[in-house]
């Protein structure tokens, strides 16, 4: 294989799109490749490694998980939600942790305004608060979609539909962000790494807004371990994963699983593999053979998981595949899976309905879609992920990329799913990160 062909294949596998010869005159960014993908393409060419094509579609067969039992399994697992929250250290989050987190987020925003020469503390009452000088045009969406709301939530502005954000008489809390951060880490150690992740961008928010610093390099460079920890060990992530595992274990218990049948699972946007670990460990513990297809829009995330799962029990396998959930899946994957899993991925697509419809095409009758997403507005997420393009891709009428359970229910049902289930818990006991299960029958 010549080097040009190898480069083309590497770019196709990293971006999931067709690349013509004419495309080689284009910039990486025009081909859908961010800096991380560019690095991954170069590594592929250097190491001469390519992914195998997806396995041919399996013929239709009886699902190993009898229809109807998914609902029972989910309801049974829901009775243990408070146990999951306690085990994960996320119980009573809204009264115990959120007030300090809210204070920290507002402090980072105030600090950014100060460093951009637009001090809110010195701003007269009635002043219209707008984008500080030097903010990149593309980051104005962070202000429109989050920053002005954060200021309103903190009482520092009132938002008028015509005039915009107007400074109030509320005094700015001048407590330094690093002092608040130190207190949170001391008093809420389970959330320490989550708030350290917030600090990565929050403490340098002004520099990111003006383009002096690249948030992608900040988050995926030396802070990559904090991202991995967030997806795997952050209390709300752990609680949601425990809930998902409980559903799977319940389905495999009491003879509901048909012995001798392997389970076909596909994960959309597997990324760093935080959810994968819980699901695979549950299947291995239950001694259930499985085929697990680990997908992401870029293969740059695959290396660590390939190494982690290179030795699986007999009868089980893991495949790695570049998959863009925003386009129809390849024919080889249609109706090929009993379970599709996705954590913190689908929200970052242009159209929830299109993405959910494409997921539905992957499932066979009796299968289900396990979706883990933030369904409560968490402003700290905007200070971290709001600096990335994927946070603002939506073109389907959403006001923000995160939506509540009722919106997910509507989109999933319109996409061909039947029941959409979630833990109906409100108040201090509600988790900000929810497991939703959508059934196919």
Curated annotation (Swiss-Prot):
Gene3D superfamilies, A to Z: Vaccinia Virus protein VP39 (3.40.50.150)
UniProt organism field: Ustilaginoidea virens
Record's protein name: Polyketide methyltransferase ustM
Swiss-Prot/TrEMBL GO biological process terms: biosynthetic process; methylation
Keyword check for Cell division: no
GO MF entries: methyltransferase activity
Family: Belongs to the methyltransferase superfamily.
Biological function: Polyketide methyltransferase; part of the gene cluster that mediates the biosynthesis of ustilaginoidins, dimeric gamma-naphthopyrones isolated from different fungal species. The first step in the biosynthesis of ustilaginoidins is the production of gamma-naphthopyrone precursor YWA1 by the non-reducing polyketide synthase ustP, via condensation of one acetyl-CoA starter unit with 6 malonyl-CoA units. YWA1 is then probably substrate of the ustZ to yield norrubrofusarin via a dehydration reaction.
InterPro entries: Methyltransf_12, Polyketide_Synthase, SAM-dependent_MTases_sf
Any single Pfam family the record assigns to this protein: Methyltransf_12
Enzyme class, spelled out: transferase
Record key words, sorted: Methyltransferase, Transferase
Region (Methyltransferase (CMeT) domain): 266-368
Pathway(s) annotated for this protein in UniProt: Secondary metabolite biosynthesis
Intrachain S-S bonds: none
TM annotation in the entry: none
EC number per UniProt: 2.1.1.-
């Amino acid at each position: 294989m010549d080097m040009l062909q190898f480069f083309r294949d590497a770019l196709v596998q990293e971006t999931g799109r067709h690349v013509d010869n004419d495309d080689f005159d284009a910039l990486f960014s025009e081909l859908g490749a961010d800096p991380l993908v560019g690095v991954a393409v170069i590594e592929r060419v250097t190491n001469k490694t390519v992914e195998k094509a997806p396995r041919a579609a399996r013929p239709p067969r009886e699902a190993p998980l009898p229809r109807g039992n998914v609902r029972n399994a989910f309801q049974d697992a829901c009775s243990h939600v408070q146990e999951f929250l306690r085990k994960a250290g996320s119980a009573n989050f809204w009264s115990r942790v959120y007030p300090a987190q809210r204070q920290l987020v507002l402090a980072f925003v105030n600090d950014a305004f100060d460093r951009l020469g637009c001090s809110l503390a010195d701003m007269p009452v009635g002043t219209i608060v707008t984008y500080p000088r030097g903010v990149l045009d593309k980051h104005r969406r962070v202000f429109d979609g989050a920053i002005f709301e954060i200021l309103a939530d903190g009482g520092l502005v009132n938002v008028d539909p015509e005039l915009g954000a107007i400074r109030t008489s509320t005094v700015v809390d001048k407590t330094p962000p690093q002092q608040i951060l130190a207190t949170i880490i001391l008093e809420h150690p389970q959330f320490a790494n989550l708030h350290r992740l917030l600090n990565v961008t929050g403490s340098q928010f002004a520099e990111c807004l003006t383009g002096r610093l690249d948030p992608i390099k900040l988050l995926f460079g030396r802070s990559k371990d904090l991202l991995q920890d967030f997806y795997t060990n952050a209390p709300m992530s752990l609680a949601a994963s425990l809930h998902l595992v409980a559903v799977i274990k319940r389905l495999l218990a009491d003879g509901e699983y048909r012995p001798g049948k392997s389970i076909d699972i596909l994960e959309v946007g597997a990324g760093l593999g935080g959810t994968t670990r819980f699901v695979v460990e549950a299947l291995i513990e239950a001694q259930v053979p499985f085929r697990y297809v680990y997908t992401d829009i870029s293969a740059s995330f695959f290396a660590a998981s390939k190494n982690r799962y290179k030795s699986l029990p007999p009868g089980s396998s893991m495949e790695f595949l570049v998959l863009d959930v925003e386009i129809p899946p390849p024919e080889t994957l249609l109706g090929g899976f009993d379970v599709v899993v996705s954590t913190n991925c689908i929200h970052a697509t242009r159209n929830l309905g299109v993405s959910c419809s494409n997921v539905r095409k992957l499932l066979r009758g009796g299968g289900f879609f396990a979706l883990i997403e933030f369904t409560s507005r968490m402003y700290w997420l905007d200070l971290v992920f709001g600096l990335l393009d994927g946070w603002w891709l939506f073109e389907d009428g959403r006001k923000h990329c995160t939506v509540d359970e009722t919106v997910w229910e509507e989109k999933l049902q319109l996409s061909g799913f039947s029941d959409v289930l979630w833990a109906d818990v409100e108040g201090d006991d509600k988790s900000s990160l929810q497991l939703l299960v959508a059934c196919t029958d």
